[in-house]
Structures are given as structure tokens and as C-alpha cells.
């Protein structure tokens, strides 16, 4: 009779132990996968991320937005020419050299407008090179390993009630980690959608960049491009810090490790949310 109880006890203990080990292993494997996916996504240019979306955005910009930008550029240049004439006492003191300056400015403005996507992609190419260079330095810090031998020894020392509580905790935290991962997924991919939306209207702010009064629109737009591009670098730094903290938090017991992993994942989510506003503040972008 007592042998039957012992058998049931061992069976329950083995069931909980295997489930806890599986949850624990999956959780940290999920952490490694999530970190690797983030590092891969933020290092992609708009073309590398999805060439089909990029080509669609470029086609829309060139066929729909550039004609509007051309009208804006014409208005801006005509307005500047009229202003140039009037401020010189209705051409009574007008210097013919100003016409050549205006023609040069017009040439530069038209060149910038017709090469909008080349300039825009150059910004993200620079940002990508920075992200890739940083990835080469911190990639070795992105793995969190699980010592299954120590974990099994620790679980063997627990009672059935303690194992049940730990099993319940591991399942709850596993669900929480998946919810946090979904939010992180939305942030990373939402950034790329924001980039596509931003570059789709690039010709309009670029059409104002050579004008003294309207140039602030183009300058602010360039700042926002650099902010979006270099946000990837800040995300890489956040991920590297997160991975190091995850690895160093695994020295205690399993409960501490589980809650630390969940708390640090929530912290990563918060820092990723802040990375966009921080980068805009650095580049003074509105």
C-alpha cells in the first residue's frame, strides 16, 4: 500500500519536475530567440526588411508625391525670387549675381528632389552600418544558457506542494513572457512601418529644404530620418544590456531566476518604448 503511495508521489514529482524543466528551458530559449530576432530586424534597411513593400512605397512616392512636391518647389522658388526682387528696392539696387545664386539654388533643389530616395536610403545605410558594427561587438553577449543539472538537483529537494507552486509560477510567467514578446514584436515591426510611412512622403519636405523660411520643414524631416535610423542602435544597446542582466540573474534559485527574467523582459519592453522618444530628443526632432 505504502509502495503505491510512493509510486504516485514519485510519478507526480516526475511530472512536475519535467514540466518545470521544460518551461524553464523554453523560457530562456525564447529569450535567446527574441534577442536574436530583435538584433536581426533592427539591422535591416527598408529595402532589406521587405523589398516588395519598399518598391510599392517608392512607386507611390514617385508617381503621387513627387508631382505635388514639384508644385511646392515651384511655389517656394518663385516666392523666393519675388522676395529677392522686392527687398532690393524693386530691382533699383538689384545685383545680377543674385540671379545666378537663385539659379544655382534651383538646380540644387531640383537635384535633391529627383534624388530624394537615394538621399533617404543613404541615411538608413549609415544607420545600418552603425548597427551592424555594434552587433559585431555585442553579439557574444546575447546568449543565456540554462544549467539543467543544477536545476534538476534543486527540484529534487522540493516537496510536491512546492513543486506544484513552482509549476504554476512557471506557467503564469511563461504566458506573461509571451505577452511581453508580442509587445516587443509590435514595437520592432511598428518602427519599420513608421519608417515606410515617413519615406513615402519624403519628396514634400525635401522640396522646401533650400528655402530660408520653409527650410525648417526639410531640416526637421532629416532629423526625424536620422532619429528613426539610429533608434536601431539604441535598441541594440537595450538588447545587449538585457541579455547581460538575464545571464547574471540566473545565479540564484529557480524562482528568483523566473521572476527576474519576467521583470527584465518587462524592463526591456519599457526601454524599447522609450528608445524612439530618446532618439528624437538626441537629434532634436519633433
Tell where the protein language model's regions lie, with residue ranges.
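Extended serine/threonine-enriched, polar tracts that run as long, contiguous segments within proteins
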Residues: 181-188, 192-195, 199-238
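Helical mechanochemical/support elements of P-loop NTPase systems and associated helical scaffolds
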Residues: 77, 115, 119, 185, ...
